[in-house]
Amino acid sequence: MGVKKVALACTVCGSRNYYVAENKNRTERLELNKYCKHCGQYAQHKETR
């Protein structure tokens, strides 16, 4: 069985730039400041399912 992955979507433009492995121990959604190549800036990315 493979690892289920979830996307990290940019809050500015909405593009899904990063994918991370899902962790069952984490109940809240992940939020990270990452670089968005579409916006050209560092922006907050939120976990989508």
Curated annotation (Swiss-Prot):
The lineage of its organism: Bacteria, Bacillati, Bacillota, Bacilli, Lactobacillales. Belongs to the bacterial ribosomal protein bL33 family. Coiled coil: none annotated. This is Large ribosomal subunit protein bL33B. SUPFAM superfamilies: Zn-binding ribosomal proteins. GO terms for cellular component: cytoplasm; ribonucleoprotein complex; ribosome. GO terms for biological process: translation. GO terms for molecular function: structural constituent of ribosome. The keyword Ribonucleoprotein applies. Keywords: Ribonucleoprotein, Ribosomal protein. The keyword Ribonucleoprotein applies. It comes from Latilactobacillus sakei subsp. sakei (strain 23K) (Lactobacillus sakei subsp. sakei).
